[in-house]
Amino acid sequence: MNNWYMLTLMGEDRKGIVAAVTQALFERNVTLGEASMLRLGGNFTIMMMVAADLDAETLEAALAEVVQSMGLTLHIDSMQGGLHQHITPNLIVRVSGADRAGIVARVTGALAEAGFNILDLESDVAGSPENPVYIMQIVGISETPLEELEAAVKDMREEGIEVNISPLETMVG
């Protein structure tokens, strides 16, 4: 019976991280599930669901050489896993405004209170050092009518934070 784990690896971005990690997993007959891998700042981060007939300590030992040679940190959590458990998002929220403390907390808090569930969030700071602009894109799902979600972020718009909520067309298949 396979055990499911969430692996989180992070280290300074360099060539070959994904190849080395996935090769080590392949050599131990570990099944890869969903994954998110991206560069943030100068670092590369991997979050990956895996299934294996190994305990967490053996899985950690299987990755030890790669972790050490690539200068990575590794965190392993046991989880209830499975493949093909996708939720199809129905809304996208785009946010921009002068970079200031609390934008993420305020927008996501208002959306959550209105019944919006975040599936993916990406953010960046654009503009210049003198005039930074915070940009955020949120993909999620909600059964709350669009008008109610719009009302939930109305105060932020009045403060100069641009928040656009629109239906998301998702092609499946």
Predicted regions and their residues:
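A conserved regulatory-domain signal marking ACT and ACT-like small-molecule sensing domains
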Residues: 1-173
